[in-house]
Amino acid sequence: MSLSKYFNPIPDASVTFDGATVQLEESLGAVQNDEESASEFKNVGHLEISDITFRANEGEVVLVLGNPTSALFKGLFHGHKHLKYSPEGSIRFKDNEYKQFASKCPHQIIYNNEQDIHFPYLTVEQTIDFALSCKFHIPKQERIEMRDELLKEFGLSHVKKTYVGNDYVRGVSGGERKRISIIETFIANGSVYLWDNSTKGLDSATALEFLSITQKMAKATRSVNFVKISQASDKIVSKFDKILMLGDSFQVFYGTMEECLTHFHDTLQIKKNPNDCIIEYLTSILNFKFKETSNSIVGLDTPSVVSEENQALNINNETDLHTLWIQSPYYKHWKAITSKTVQECTRKDVNPDDISPIFSIPLKTQLKTCTVRAFERIIGDRNYLISQFVSVVVQSLVIGSLFYNIPLTTIGSFSRGSLTFFSILFFTFLSLADMPASFQRQPVVRKHVQLHFYYNWVETLATNFFDCCSKFILVVIFTIILYFLAHLQYNAARFFIFLLFLSVYNFCMVSLFALTALIAPTLSMANLLAGILLLAIAMYASYVIYMKDMHPWFIWIAYLNPAMFAMEAILSNELFNLKLDCHESIIPRGEYYDNISFSHKACAWQGATLGNDYVRGRDYLKSGLKYTYHHVWRNFGIIIGFLCFFLFCSLLAAEYITPLFTRENLLRWNNYLKRYCPFLNSQKKNNKSAITNNDGVCTPKTPIANFSTSSSSVPSVSHQYDTDYNIKHPDETVNNHTKESVAMETQKHVISWKNINYTIGDKKLINDASGYISSGLTALMGESGAGKTTLLNVLSQRTESGVVTGELLIDGQPLTNIDAFRRSIGFVQQQDVHLELLTVRESLEISCVLRGDGDRDYLGVVSNLLRLPSEKLVADLSPTQRKLLSIGVELVTKPSLLLFLDEPTSGLDAEAALTIVQFLKKLSMQGQAILCTIHQPSKSVISYFDNIYLLKRGGECVYFGSLPNACDYFVAHDRRLTFDREMDNPADFVIDVVGSGSTNIPMDDAEKPTSSKIDEPVSYHKQSDSINWAELWQSSPEKVRVADDLLLLEEEARKSGVDFTTSVWSPPSYMEQIKLITKRQYICTKRDMTYVFAKYALNAGAGLFIGFSFWRTKHNINGLQDAIFLCFMMLCVSSPLINQVQDKALQSKEVYIAREARSNTYHWTVLLIAQTIVELPLAISSSTLFFLCCYFCCGFETSARVAGVFYLNYILFSMYYLSFGLWLLYSAPDLQTAAVFVAFLYSFTASFCGVMQPYSLFPRFWTFMYRVSPYTYFIETFVSLLLHDREVNCSTSEMVPSQPVMGQTCGQFMKPFIDEFGGKLHINNTYTVCAYCMYTVGDDFLAQENMSYHHRWRNFGFEWVFVCFNIAAMFVGFYLTYIKKIWPSVIDGIKKCIPSMRRSKTSHNPNEQSV
């Protein structure tokens, strides 16, 4: 099918710059200011590019080179916000002023960067289906055909049922994920496309296909495309119609590629190195490297490329290049065209013909599409789905059985109130657990909104709608189980009203916490807001504090609380028509009073009337709780109003507030904090181990040339190198041996693998692979998805699942010491996973000390090599710098056996890529064995590799040997192939030959005419399709020679008699590991000021809120009840605090799982211990703040005997919730599941502590849980400390009136009862009405609640036991989850039990698996 017919761009599109001087915010670009120290504040910088003049027409693809490219692209993308240019110049889209056009038609400007952000639990086809549904209002069948065609074009048909995945969720490979991003961008259907390093992670063949498709799409849809590429072969460069070259301050060229080369090479006489590809040549001009001699070009001893003519032109700086550009005929040509275009443009407003609807589908379809995707997300994330379902079912069973068969008595009415309150509170906690998922959705939603797939508020509305639907199912399950176990009224009306209000209240909480997530910039701040909201909801639901007892300054909160209205409606619905038996509450009672008329007794329950041994439910509601049944449907309307209000505010926040929380805005805010709050500055200006030079690069105080260690450091590949020890080009010989002592003393070993097969399920990813590495630099190459990363993981012993067969040998001997092997190798992952709040130097130092020899001086060498600003935070690094840091983290370990690198040059510009490969070459020349996957290598880059190991799709080896011989090998076996050593890139040649082609686009040259369609199926190198290169290699003489060479090398290695384990660096002691990781975690925590502020603010705010709510607690019966609920609310604060702790600890956990664990950086228990040690002082100090804010407001005793012991126990409680939160985080597969576990286990343990249900009413089966719940002991200790020896003076309404029999005083009449049950009389000697108070002192109340002051130290010991249990469970949970990896087995077991979850069609494709 032809795809072009579905695209409707603006006709005659063009982008014209006429002498425009553009000012751009530097933070918008990918380029970071390396000279800026992270310890110093600077305002957001601005890039100013002067005199930009060019015109790009419809159907053209323009290559843009230069440091400011990313900033320019983002400026054009956010044209109406961030693009500023001088009035003397002009920027036009057609005849429209660009900023006006960008404001009126933002959907016509499409931006794609190097980041691949997707929902990991959606499959590839679901992701593309969604994008197509948002942009094309066509029948479903056409959309499916269009999807399949796109997947076919981009070579993704074989993974369409596979999860997309991310760095932490296994899914498609990185290259395949990049292609998904490209497809999404194409689907956006714009007129101007800005491709910002969009080929990062693609091999050269796939990148060429991408450019071919872009070129065809540009011509078919008549769009304008601007492309930034860091590395590209000449064949790729030839695909571009024009090239725009930007210096830091000026434009230096625009025109065709042929004109560009003529201008610089022929006219300006800037010579080109024969091994450099075009993009390397042009990049060197922009970076002004053509003025440098061989001594300043890292590792090269080639002659100077500066000609006499060039020197005569006196090109000394960028201004000279710009001057020569404007003097050229090319500039005059384009200046005439752009001036004419601007002169003809007299329109002040945007042409109405160019304005089209921003969104391609109606709102109804947007809502439907987003809702369907929400359903697919939740079904895909099975861990989260199952954890929610299990928690609701188990919780309803447990609580239903706890309140089993509630009696129709006055005491039973309290249980009914507790059950109602618990139901409301449980679903509040469950809604709170959704906040982490809300934050994880936001980056993907932000990308889609920028692509104009839908309105931001539509996604919010759809997500809320689906969450409400899914929660409704949970509420129905919960209600059915709980309602009938508790034996609430068996009446259809009562049941459905209970279900209705619990459901609507739950919807309200879903919207409220969704709103909280949308208005908070970070999850820590969201947890702060949610913590305060949670307290307000719980305390002012009119159950913890009755309406009549609320202080007047806070009673208004109850009327703003949906829980209060839900509580009144549900409890009124249950009690209004009941008659509650009062036999357990009659005063006086006992054998002495059995024969006395009831006219002398009274029912001690609110709402009781004299002479009746029962209480009507409606009377209890009215007098005790201030409830009335007549408010039920009024409250329903009010809750619906709250729901609509929260939902409306969520939609507004999604549209206008959340978009403000971009990285750029948050960096600005962080800069303001640094400027006005110097104490927040996290960097040290003085460092004992390193100093900073003018370039912001860490250099040791000792000169590099003087480094001398037992294993000598590799000299820096910077200008500070000794000129008498240089890397020669591979074609040259190294004839200087005077500096051999400087080289790393690496004993040569032979690492070989034979008949390696790797299978996951029924899919074979590596098929009978054999090879070896002894020394030198070997490139592991193949098309995207061929299994390169998988083979690296197998060889480095990093596979986590599947079956590996075959042999891995060291010097011909089977590998037995895997731990030593892992410590002898380095592995640079494709994903750049680091702790964001460490500096570059700190990141390198940790790796050096834990995995290397601890040579801190060597850190300066690596920093100089990689040109990294040592004192800059990782969070402030550009993507390129993060990649360099990943390499540096492995280099500082000095791997003695083998260094693996997975695409180390991906995303780097040509110069940086060449620098890295040159350094790798230097290491290999010193004996280091290096195996490196590489994408898109230029001819000069690939020439540094000694050998290549070539894979085809399916993980089959098709060649192993030197690269020149590889080209000869393929040509010799297929005479129809041709290879020109002078012109062709050998890397591109071998990939083209063995690659089956990711798409069906022909690999034609730029000169070949291109069709206006993008669907002509022509395969790669048709002439080679009939050859099975894998089978040919297995029987080839070349493989026999490889085997013979391996035997000789192994024999030499065995003769040396050196065991590779002798060169393994001894790891630091266990205590040293703990010390170093604890210091690291402390630094990361200290620098996260948002987290620290949120923790202290939540404790202070919650303490004051609770303290003022229970202000000066009275010495009456209500005061006793208030004391219990005060302590219960103090424990409730732990829930949002746990969420904060988990969010913070997640960062280091993910880094450990993704990188450090696989590299044996330190023992897994070290991370858990270090995180606990670092969090402990924060928990204690913040809990101290809470205690000070709360305790002294409530009016309890302030002596050390009471307040001191209370404080001691609360500090222990802070240790409990800290260890509890870390246990669940380290035992759960992800943060969302951990949040559900917190909600479930918190409500589970809290329900058995005797607050919700009195111990006397516990079913016998559950009495053990009363003893097992840690909250039982905390509550008993806290309440007994507050109420011990506290005098009770009942208020008039709390006095129980009774009438003595004739001839007796009240004291005489009530004495038997008081002797048995306690209490006191207001007046003993009266003969009329006896005013009885149930308690004399607080200990009487404690005894009734099964509590005792004398248990406080016993409880203190039990509390320590629970803390120790949490810590032990944390270790066990982490071991089972991440060492033994039990979760996949658990999920598989559940899938077998639930047939609907058996999704065989959605299998994973771990060709190049993520963690």
Curated annotation (Swiss-Prot):
Gene Ontology biological process terms in this record: sterol import
Residues involved in ATP binding: G782, E783, S784, G785, A786, G787, K788, T789
Look up keyword Glycoprotein and say if it applies.
Answer: yes
Recall the GO molecular function terms of this protein's record: ABC-type transporter activity; ATP binding; ATP hydrolysis activity; ATPase-coupled transmembrane transporter activity
Membrane topology per the entry is: Multi-pass membrane protein
Report the principal subcellular site: membrane
Record Pfam families: ABC2_membrane (PF01061), ABC2_membrane_7 (PF19055), ABC_tran (PF00005), PDR_CDR (PF06422)
List the protein's name: ATP-dependent permease PDR11
UniProt source species: Saccharomyces cerevisiae (strain ATCC 204508 / S288c) (Baker's yeast)
